[in-house]
């Protein structure tokens, strides 16, 4: 740490900006940062590449903002303040939002299936009544419109992959909220660098290094999210049974996301109780 501080004092750290970007990208590959959770979310909603980019950037923005808030708040509140003391609370808050999101995803899928079954029942009843009044072949023109259940996203995908979402789609605000939540866990390394720069009265340098680090992190998170979105599109084109699997995928995805939320909540609670 002493050698790095010397480099900062001499102003040579500008040379390490590309290195900070690379370190941020590599840091994003480490366990955590909600990569699995974000990929599961994108797959569950059959998200587009645009939505995947939005999700990754939102996580990066909140990740960077938390670094700044902790660094400045720590200096103002207490000199003994550490990132470790705030992390349990952030984990607990994130867990509540994540579990709520998982519950919403599960409920949304279940409601879509229930509405579809009710509509099918009403249609079959009307069609049966129509057959008693007229014995012609009118009924044969309607069977192709009602196959096995598809949620809103699957029906839209069958018509046009770029318009797969209807009125019950995941909104941009919901995607942003999920991404912002995923980035709430701070990075102690980035906080340390920023604190050193602030103490050395090199605020601009510290901000630049943190932004560079976050840019590298964004590259990783966006790549993971976009990869999940592209995978959904390609598999749907190549495998005819994808829609059958996809209609159940939201249940598994919501379960996975819920387990991640529970895991974060337990660790956050244990950290607070220490």
Swiss-Prot record:
InterPro entries: Ni/Co_transpt_high_affinity, NiCoT_RcnA. Pfam families: NicO. It is found in: Cell inner membrane. One of its GO terms (cellular component) is plasma membrane. The chain crosses the membrane at residues 13-33, 57-77, 87-107, 175-195, 210-230, 252-272. Residues 127-153 are annotated as: Disordered. Residues 1-12, 78-86, 196-209, 273-274 are periplasmic. This is Nickel/cobalt efflux system RcnA. Belongs to the NiCoT transporter (TC 2.A.52) family. RcnA subfamily. One of its GO terms (molecular function) is monoatomic cation efflux transmembrane transporter activity. Residues 34-56, 108-174, 231-251 are cytoplasmic. It comes from the Bacteria. Keywords: Cell inner membrane, Cell membrane, Cobalt, Cobalt transport, Ion transport, Membrane, Nickel, Nickel transport, Transmembrane, Transmembrane helix, Transport. PANTHER family: NICKEL/COBALT EFFLUX SYSTEM RCNA, NICKEL_COBALT EFFLUX SYSTEM RCNA. Efflux system for nickel and cobalt. It is a multi-pass membrane protein. It comes from Escherichia coli O6:K15:H31 (strain 536 / UPEC). Residues 127-137 have a biased composition (Basic and acidic residues). GO terms for biological process: cobalt ion transport; response to cobalt ion; response to nickel cation. Its main location: membrane. Induction: By nickel and cobalt. Transcriptionally repressed by RcnR.
